[in-house]
Amino acid sequence: TNNNNFNNINNNNNNNNNNNNNNNNNNNNNNNNNNNSNNNNNNNNNYNSNNNNNNNNNNNNNNNNNNNNNNNNNNNNNNNNNNNNNNNNNNNNNNNNNNTSFNDNCNNNSNYHNHSNHHPLFESLQNINQYPLSPNNNKSSNQHLSHSSSNVNSQYYQTPYYQPSQKQNSPNSTPPLNGCQYENHNLNSNNTFFKKNTNHYISQQLYQQQFNQNVNNNNNNNNISNNNNNSYNINCNNNNNNNNSNYNNNSYNNNNNYNNNNNNNNNNNNNNNNNNNNNNIFNENNNNNNNNNNNNNNNCNNNYNNNDNNENKYCVPKIEIPQKNLQYSPPPFQLDSGSTTPKTPSAPTSPVLSPKTSNKICDLVLNIVPICQELSNEDGYQNKELLNKIQEYFEDAIREIKKIKKTRLPLMKQNHTKESDDKTFYSLRPRRNRKCTIKTKTLQSSNSEEIVCQACGTRASPEWRKGPDGFKSLCNACGLYYAKTKKRENEIIGQPDLIPKHMKIHNLIND
């Protein structure tokens, strides 16, 4: 018994999830158990055995798990040697991810393709034809299939070249059952590759045919991020358990249809979706095709069913008021639902109001609507009470708008220039240790209570002294000089004998 376990892990391994512990047993029963440490994900357990009876039992257990366990994503591919081909699709309904297992080594080949109708991401889906196989062809023995990727060595993969103008199958049609014919749904650069071991129990050509026929149409990369687990079952006890994990937000969501990198609002597990995401087992031998409706939406609207942004919370339906048989009656007041919806300006430079503020103004305006209805029914608009109510509502709305303007308008540029900038004070005395005569410019404080020296214009002084006006308007130095000069003048005036013959008072003061 050969157990071929392939684990493709993108980027880092030092993360929170210990995933994909593949136990390789030496028994004849091939059980590839994926022990996932995720609490919510016990996914993709592939029980492959040689007995047809065990496969039938596993299928019954899988149906019970898919129907009863809404919190577990159980997609078990259990068809190895049966004549019935069960295609278990792990449907990621948020990203339209289809995991389809093709067991073509049985008598009946049933290939099921689950498409998304007219989705813009699937406009480039192409059909890849089956590889030509020959028993003597050495290339085909090493031929491996891969989804289109740029990070894969060319020595392991040989991807067929196909033209974009190749004819596509219709979205709802089942492709012809000719071995490994599948559609390339890979739109991203995530890699899914398969590596082959030589089987000692089957010939080289038979192994190649079975490997190519059992290729899983593995839509790992239908949308922006896919974490899909794909099972590739090969006959004669060859179990290819491919565990693919995409690196999402520094953690591995392995064996998990759990989308963290999608642009949608819902993180959906297979059986845990609010959008009716079902794990469908497709039995093609019974001609029962269960189409999952969540993967057949035109624009993937199932991911936006819970979007509250599409609701017009403050929209008012149209109001039609019957007209009275009067000589003059105004036309009925109609309010369109879209006219009262607060619109956010698209210009980046325009001030954007918060939803709370815009809704408050909208409520103030909408309160006027019933009053306008009553006024339209009145004769001649002579009801003063209704007019007063309207005036009050308008005043409240205007008051609120003015408050918003005060907060939204830019502040006025403050003028820091003062009148005292233009004032100059001429020195009445030469300053100490200063031999030049320069006009001293000093700033006068805007505070009228602050004292300024009237002679030199200083504001700081240890003591304020009396000036010519009789008040303490001079600083300490100017006050002392003024007092000394005045005292000397008084002494000379009181004693005329001390005055020289050719000396006058003004000459003394100037000296």
From Swiss-Prot:
Signal peptide: none annotated. SMART domains: ZnF_GATA. CDD domains: ZnF_GATA (cd00202). The keyword Nucleotide-binding does not apply. InterPro entries: GATA_ZnFinger_Domain, Znf_GATA, Znf_NHR/GATA. It holds the Pfam family GATA. A zinc finger (GATA-type) spans 453-478. Residues 1-111, 136-166, 214-309, 337-351 have a biased composition (Low complexity). It comes from the Eukaryota. Keywords: Metal-binding, Zinc, Zinc-finger. GO terms for biological process: regulation of DNA-templated transcription. Disulfide bonds: none annotated. GO terms for molecular function: sequence-specific DNA binding; zinc ion binding. Residues 124-135, 167-185 have a biased composition (Polar residues). Transmembrane segments: none annotated. Residues 1-194, 214-313, 325-355 are annotated as: Disordered. PANTHER family: GATA TRANSCRIPTION FACTOR 22-RELATED (PTHR47255), GATA ZINC FINGER DOMAIN-CONTAINING PROTEIN 12 (PTHR47255:SF4). This is GATA zinc finger domain-containing protein 15.
